[in-house]
Structures are given as structure tokens and as C-alpha cells.
Amino acid sequence: MEVSMRKPYFIEEEDDGFVSLSEMEAGVSSPSCYNYPQSYYYNHHHHQYSVSSPRSGKFHDFRFDNSYYGYGQPHFLDSCFLCKKRLGDNRDIFMYRGDTPFCSEECREEQIERDEAKEKKQSLSTSVKAMRRNEKRSSSSSPTRSRNYAFRTGTVAAA
């Protein structure tokens, strides 16, 4: 039977911030408190930066989570995506593509039209680029081939 060694709660040596793969799989992370000089606490954050869940295998990094610091981003259902009007108060919310809220069908339709126009423009741009690429490829593959230049065949007499 294998006995796993646990790190002491207070670490005397310097921590490089890396967690081994086996520690991540086991759900172990760096301790949240270190035995640093008191001046370090005033200049650096000393909380646990990351947590991995052994059940889900997901890894959450609190360094990029603003809600951890008390000033989180507003919930995505707080305002209309297009006109930024406040949502809620038992009014209907019109969703588009699963995660985009709108205050009315009109705002939702406007966004749908914008997205369709954008997709159409990208599609045209892509097809024009492909056509130019094919044109360039065919012209460079046979340089001696006639390029529809007008010329006459026959005898030329020069004096």
C-alpha cells in the first residue's frame, strides 16, 4: 500500500507555483498560506490561486475570476445585448443562439439580420479569395498557354 506524502501547511522553502500532474489529478493544490515575511503579505496576494475538482476534472483559476475579489461582471441576463436596456422585472427575455438575451423580438430580429449580413459578407469574401487563388494557380501552372490575346495567324513579310 502506497502512502502519499502531504506537504506541510506552512512551507519554509520558496514555492515555484507549479503543481504536478499527480497532485492535480488528486485534487491537491498549493496551500493558501505561506510562511513569508510580513512585508510580503502587504505586497502580494496570498490566497489559493487554483482548485481542481477530482470528480469533474475541471480546473478553476481564481486569478482570472473577478467575482472572487468582490467586483464581478454583471450576469449575462441583466441587460439586452443590443440596446443594453435592463432585463428582468418579470418581463420576457428573448434568447438568440442560446446565450444572447434581448428585451424584445425587434432587438432579437435586428441582431439576427446583422449576423446574417456579416456571415454573407464573410462567405462572399471567402469565395472571392478562393476564386482568385484558383485563377492564380491555373495561370501559373501553364505560362505558355494563350491568355485570350487577339492575334492573327498567317504569313508575315518583312522588308
From Swiss-Prot:
Keywords: Metal-binding, Zinc, Zinc-finger
Function text: May act as an adapter to facilitate the interaction of SnRK1 complex with effector proteins, conferring tissue- and stimulus-type specific differences in the SnRK1 regulation pathway.
Superkingdom, taxonomy of origin: Eukaryota
Family label: Belongs to the FLZ family.
Ranges of compositional bias, category Basic and acidic residues: 113-122
Complexes and interactors: Interacts with KIN10 and KIN11 via its FLZ-type zinc finger domain. Interacts with KINB1, KINB2, KINB3 and SNF4 via its N-terminal part. Forms heterodimer with FLZ7, FLZ10, FLZ11, FLZ12, FLZ15, FLZ17 and FLZ18 in vitro.
Pfam families, A to Z: zf-FLZ
Zinc finger (FLZ-type): 75-119
Entry's induction text: Down-regulated in response to mild as well as prolonged energy depletion. Down-regulated by the glycolysis inhibitor 2DG. Up-regulated by glucose, sucrose and mannose.
Region annotation (Disordered) ranges: 113-159
Biological processes per GO annotation: response to glucose; response to mannose; response to starvation; response to sucrose
Single annotated GO MF: zinc ion binding
PANTHER family in the cross-refs: FCS-LIKE ZINC FINGER 1-RELATED, FCS-LIKE ZINC FINGER 2
Protein's recorded name: FCS-Like Zinc finger 2
